[in-house]
């Protein structure tokens, strides 16, 4: 212990150090300097190497503009793919779409190192979003088939032809703050060669300055216009600790009304993604959804994330003149044209409110007009649905909104490539508000409602409960600011679909109003919250599962008979009353099909619940709701959907390429439930059972009364 202390070893610095290599680049001579000798042979022939061929017809001149809240997506062309994004964006994250809860479980750290410098992060989440739209007219559907034929040839297998675009690789373009673009409907990359040179100046003129400039998130996009891009956030596991109310299902970014992201439940966010394709002004595709951005082209649309205290300006234009997600009575359409079309005199002044209808129009039987609603909002106007054969009485939302900014008398149909093309005006806030005024009730709901209490918020707005003064009954009021929507036209879904379709198992909308610049939708208040609370915190027996399935299938059978596809079936979209009755809600993503438009193609829904044909970009119909219901059954059995521990894009790849998912503990499931599930989770849509067929399945005979659900609600509230 008294030994001599060892001397500390000293380490000298480097000796005879020489800085032999210092690599640089001479911009004047366009040469590298100071390269190691071994590298010279690799670069010696660079100067003599021919430059890559660039087709000038494929380059669109653009003008840099301030950041724009509204950016439109391009139609994916031949080279686009789901795979390109699936390969590159496995770490994209998703947030619960329609949760209105104020609490959220802790979020596992995704690891900052896994995200490149192009990703903007907050609380471990990354947001990507772009939107485009969906073909919904007969001509559009025919054009889509013609385009596939021209791209892939006559002898291509139909299934492969539909999914070929999902087999190539995409690449990524990073868009930074202030570099977003706005554009009206744009042509395909493959169509540019057919345009005259003057058409580029027309495209260039479509870029517009930003209304808002406080957006802070960076976006990284697939430049090959891959059909996949998301405005959602992802947490791989569910954690207890959520309170019980349900949030709107639209796939918008978080709105401005609340605190930071940590205050809300993390659930997969519904995604509305698709393509916008080029058409002349009078032949615009009615499309909605989202596509990915072409490099150096102002294509694509984005919902930008903002600072928690900032604003998320969602001019849903998730705007464009797009997605006919439902049909609008033709008289509504005619009124909108009369009110909002530009004056024939060529004046630039548009009417700022609903114009007085001439006598002939007033006598046309506008029975569903809001101006003939009864004074009591509970007396919702009854609507007699025409059969699918009489769909000529209905106009798509795209056409409806197109009428706001375009009049055939003012804008003659332009020819492709013509330098004299008339540029359509973008729908102004006043025009859109005037159009919406036609389908809502007149008056101010505050005259008969009081005691507004905010119970939650969603991506489109906030939800309050209010008390009806003369009855004391509680109602739910969804308040949505028109100026802060990502796709304003989808607000028509909130009004028209819920107004016109009434069923015991569909959430009832009493009325809707325009209060200032906000759309207020007054609907029944369901105290039981969302089914998600039950599947997350409890375990359901087969009687309870059958009870839920029976109610949902009744609602779906009714909607499908009317030609309505819900497109976002999941536990978040199922609400419960205090006595256990089950109702379907969240119609923001629904779509109408008819004989004229028998299929849809936009990538819509929440990844884990999406049907394979939706992910593969194949035309689909009401069968997609049946697949999603099957996934929801697995959710009720296992507590979460299949692949929920994987990133959404990886899960989508597995859904698209793998056999139908199975229950984790198959031995715990009865054979009758397995048979019921097998009829829904069929990869081939034509072989999938319909809602009407499933209503006759023996499994549903196990269904009990609504009261059998009540113990589950009590159980999760004790967590």
From Swiss-Prot:
**Record keywords, A-Z:** Apoptosis, ATP-binding, Cytoplasm, Kinase, Mitochondrion, Nucleotide-binding, Nucleus, Phosphoprotein, Serine/threonine-protein kinase, Transferase
Q: Where is the composition biased (Low complexity)?
A: 358-373
UniProt record, GO biological process: apoptotic process; cell migration; cell population proliferation; cellular response to starvation; cytoskeleton organization; intracellular signal transduction; learning; locomotory behavior
Listed result of changing residue 312 to P: In a colorectal adenocarcinoma sample; somatic mutation
Q: Which residues carry this modification: Phosphothreonine?
A: 107
Tell me which residues this entry annotates as catalytic.
568 (proton acceptor)
Q: Which reaction does it catalyse?
A: L-seryl-[protein] + ATP = O-phospho-L-seryl-[protein] + ADP + H(+); L-threonyl-[protein] + ATP = O-phospho-L-threonyl-[protein] + ADP + H(+)
Ranges where the record places region Disordered:
1-29, 97-123, 256-299, 340-373
Q: Where in the numbering of this chain does the CRIB domain appear?
A: 11-24
Please list the residue ranges that the record marks as compositionally biased, kind Polar residues.
271-291
Quote the PTM field. Answer: Autophosphorylated when activated by CDC42/p21.
Role according to the record: Serine/threonine protein kinase that plays a role in a variety of different signaling pathways including cytoskeleton regulation, cell migration, proliferation or cell survival. Activation by various effectors including growth factor receptors or active CDC42 and RAC1 results in a conformational change and a subsequent autophosphorylation on several serine and/or threonine residues. Phosphorylates the proto-oncogene RAF1 and stimulates its kinase activity. Promotes cell survival by phosphorylating the BCL2 antagonist of cell death BAD.
**PANTHER family, alphabetized:** NON-SPECIFIC SERINE_THREONINE PROTEIN KINASE, SERINE/THREONINE-PROTEIN KINASE SAMKA-RELATED-RELATED
State the domain notes: An autoinhibitory domain is present in the N-terminal region of the protein.
Protein name from the UniProt record: Serine/threonine-protein kinase PAK 5
Q: What gene name does this entry carry?
A: PAK5
């Amino acid at each position: 212990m008294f030994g001599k202390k060892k001397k500390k070893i000293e380490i000298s610095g480097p000796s005879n150090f020489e800085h032999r290599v210092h690599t640089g680049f001479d911009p004047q001579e366009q040469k590298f300097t100071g390269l190691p000798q071994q590298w010279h042979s690799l670069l010696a022939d660079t100067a003599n190497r021919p430059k890559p061929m660039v087709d000038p017809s494929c380059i669109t001149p653009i003008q840099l503009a301030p950041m724009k809240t509204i950016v439109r997506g391009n139609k994916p062309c031949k080279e686009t793919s789901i795979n390109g994004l699936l390969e590159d964006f496995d770490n994209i994250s998703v947030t619960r779409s329609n949760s209105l809860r104020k609490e959220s479980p802790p979020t596992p750290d995704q690891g900052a190192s896994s995200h490149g410098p192009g990703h903007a992060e907050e609380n471990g989440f990354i947001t990507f979003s772009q939107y485009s739209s969906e073909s919904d007219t007969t001509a559009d559907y025919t054009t889509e088939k013609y385009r596939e034929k021209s791209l892939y040839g006559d002898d291509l297998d139909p299934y492969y032809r539909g999914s070929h675009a999902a087999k190539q690789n995409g690449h990524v373009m990073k868009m930074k703050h202030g570099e977003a673009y706005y554009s009206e409907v744009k042509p395909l990359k493959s169509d540019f060669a057919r345009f005259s040179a003057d058409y580029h100046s027309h495209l260039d003129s479509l870029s517009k300055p930003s209304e808002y400039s406080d957006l802070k998130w960076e976006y990284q996009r697939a430049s090959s216009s891959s059909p996949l891009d998301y405005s959602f956030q992802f947490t791989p596991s569910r954690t207890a600790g959520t309170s019980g109310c349900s949030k709107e299902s639209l796939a918008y970014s978080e709105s401005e009304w609340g605190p930071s992201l940590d205050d809300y439940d993390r659930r997969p966010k519904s995604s509305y993604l698709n393509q916008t394709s080029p058409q002349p002004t009078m032949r615009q595709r009615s499309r909605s959804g989202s596509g990915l951005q072409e490099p150096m082209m102002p294509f694509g649309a984005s919902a930008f994330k903002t600072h928690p205290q900032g604003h998320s300006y969602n001019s849903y234009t998730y705007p464009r003149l797009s997605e006919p997600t439902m049909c609008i009575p033709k008289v509504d359409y005619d009124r909108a044209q009369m009110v909002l079309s530009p004056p024939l005199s060529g004046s630039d002044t548009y009417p700022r409110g609903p114009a007085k209808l001439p006598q002939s129009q007033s006598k046309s039987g506008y029975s569903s007009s809001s101006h003939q609603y009864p004074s009591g909002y509970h007396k919702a106007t009854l609507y007699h649905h025409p059969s699918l054969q009489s769909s000529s009485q209905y106009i798509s939302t795209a056409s409806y909104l197109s009428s706001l900014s375009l009049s055939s008398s003012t804008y003659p149909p332009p020819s492709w490539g013509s330098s004299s093309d008339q540029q359509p005006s973008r729908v102004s806030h006043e025009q859109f508000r005037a159009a919406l005024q036609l389908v809502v009730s007149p008056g101010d709901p505050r005259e008969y409602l009081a005691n507004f209490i905010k119970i939650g918020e969603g991506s489109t707005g906030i939800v309050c409960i209010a008390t009806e003064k003369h009855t004391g009954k509680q109602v739910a009021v969804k308040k949505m600011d028109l100026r802060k929507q990502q796709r304003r036209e989808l607000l028509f879904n909130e009004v028209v679909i819920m107004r016109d379709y009434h069923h015991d198992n569909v959430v009832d909308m009493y009325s809707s109003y325009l209060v200032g610049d906000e759309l207020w939708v007054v609907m029944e208040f369901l105290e039981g919250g969302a089914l998600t609370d039950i599947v997350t915190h409890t375990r359901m027996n087969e009687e309870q599962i059958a009870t839920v399935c029976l109610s949902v299938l009744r609602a779906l059978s009714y909607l499908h008979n009317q030609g309505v596809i819900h497109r976002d079936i999941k536990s978040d979209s199922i609400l419960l009353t205090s006595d256990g009755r089950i109702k379907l809600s969240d119609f923001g993503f629904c779509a109408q099909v008819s004989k004229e438009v028998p299929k849809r193609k936009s990538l819509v829904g929440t990844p884990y619940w999406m049907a394979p044909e939706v992910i593969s970009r194949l035309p689909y119909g009401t069968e997609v709701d049946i697949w999603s219901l099957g996934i929801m059954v697995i959710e009720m059995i296992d507590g979460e959907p299949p692949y929920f521990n994987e990133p959404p894009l990886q899960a989508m790849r597995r859904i698209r390429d793998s056999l139908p998912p199975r229950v984790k503990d198959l031995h715990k499931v009865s054979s009758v439930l397995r048979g019921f599930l097998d009829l829904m989770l069929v990869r081939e849509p034509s072989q999938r059972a319909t809602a009407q067929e499933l209503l006759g399945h023996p499994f549903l005979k196990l269904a009990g009364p609504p009261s059998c659900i009540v113990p589950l609600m009590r159980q999760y509230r004790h967590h």
